[in-house]
Curated annotation (Swiss-Prot):
Lineage: Bacteria, Pseudomonadati, Pseudomonadota, Betaproteobacteria, Neisseriales
Disulfide bonds: none
Protein name in UniProt: GTP cyclohydrolase FolE2
Signal sequence range: none
GO terms classed as biological process: tetrahydrofolate biosynthetic process
Protein EC: 3.5.4.16
Source organism per UniProt: Neisseria meningitidis serogroup C (strain 053442)
Entry similarity comment: Belongs to the GTP cyclohydrolase IV family.
Length: 298
């Protein structure tokens, strides 16, 4: 019997929208199709992971972690390319020895759509079907770039933000969440009040994790946070801009407590958002430790 290569198997997995090209195979029939092809392989090659396990312990999540992969993003401001780190896992029943590790990468190798929440839903559903599981989770972490305009000179430059999109499916029910880390400037109100000359200020990382009933854009979360900071950050500033941001921060001092409360107030006002966590870490310029605050809602 002629052996089938893995690429021969994958070439038949033409799922509309995920595996484009050729004849589409309905997702509901995918696992039966995979089983037929795998039986041909197993006639010659032992398939240890498909054997039974006798320890009677299911595994909540098993799969691959930190797969680096190029992706394109569909956002409110257009399409951009970036490099993502993916963690892809599925539920493994007690009687099954192992999952099909190669299928996670095979799925991504065939994926070519611009990623948004709708595509993440489809990708998660296809993974669960491909791995013949009842539950699965995909987390996609990546640097997100936004073009910013300096406040005085008008010069433009890019600023990066850390983003993680997560899709999770269990027994047919799907949910997604988003996490965004926004770097900003904070200036200490106490230092301003007691000092004759200036006040200590520093970079802060504000992290927002949220779930929503309707899609909330990455850019919207960034805007919520930057509006509450002592001042925004910019990739490139000229001297007039530097003067502006220094004075802007001085006129808008914020404790770490102020930061999380003000951001939380903005998020609560957005009725699309069901739940969130806001964290702020201020890298104190006068200490060798950070100031930190955390709010969870509801």
């Amino acid at each position: 019997m002629q052996l089938l290569k893995a690429s021969d198997i994958i070439s038949h997995l033409q799922i509309d929208g995920i595996f484009p090209g050729g004849n589409a195979i309905p997702c509901t029939h995918l696992n039966n199709y995979m089983n037929i092809k795998e039986k041909q392989l197993m006639n010659t090659i032992a398939d240890v992971q498909s054997s039974r396990d006798l320890r009677n312990l299911p595994i909540n999540q098993v799969g691959i972690k930190d797969l680096r992969f190029p992706i394109t993003l569909q956002t409110a401001e257009g399409i951009q390319s970036t490099i993502a780190r993916l963690t892809m896992t599925v539920y493994l029943p007690a009687e099954q020895k192992g999952t099909h590790m190669s299928r996670f990468v095979a799925l991504m190798e065939q994926y070519s759509e611009a990623l948004d929440f709708a595509q993440l839903h489809r990708l998660t559903a296809e993974m669960v079907a491909l791995l013949d599981s009842r539950a699965g989770k995909i987390s996609v972490s990546f640097p997100f770039f936004r073009k910013k305009t300096a406040p005085v000179s008008g010069i433009q430059s890019l600023l990066d933000y850390d983003v993680c999109l997560t899709g999770e499916m269990k027994d047919g029910a799907y949910g997604h969440s988003m996490k965004v880390m926004i770097p900003v400037t904070s200036l200490c109100p106490c230092s301003k009040e007691i000092s004759q000359y200036g006040a200590h200020n520093q970079r802060s990382h504000v992290t927002v994790s949220l779930t929503a009933d309707a899609e909330v854009g990455i850019e919207e979360v960034i805007d919520y946070v930057e509006a509450q900071a002592s001042c925004q950050l910019y990739g490139l500033l000229k001297r007039p801009d530097e003067k502006y941001v220094t004075e802007k921060a001085y006129e808008n001092p914020k404790f770490v407590e102020d930061m999380v409360r003000d951001v939380a107030t903005s998020l609560i006002a957005d009725k699309r958002i069901k739940s969130f966590v806001v964290e702020s870490e201020n890298f104190e310029s006068i200490h060798n430790h950070s100031a930190y605050a955390y709010i969870a809602y509801p």
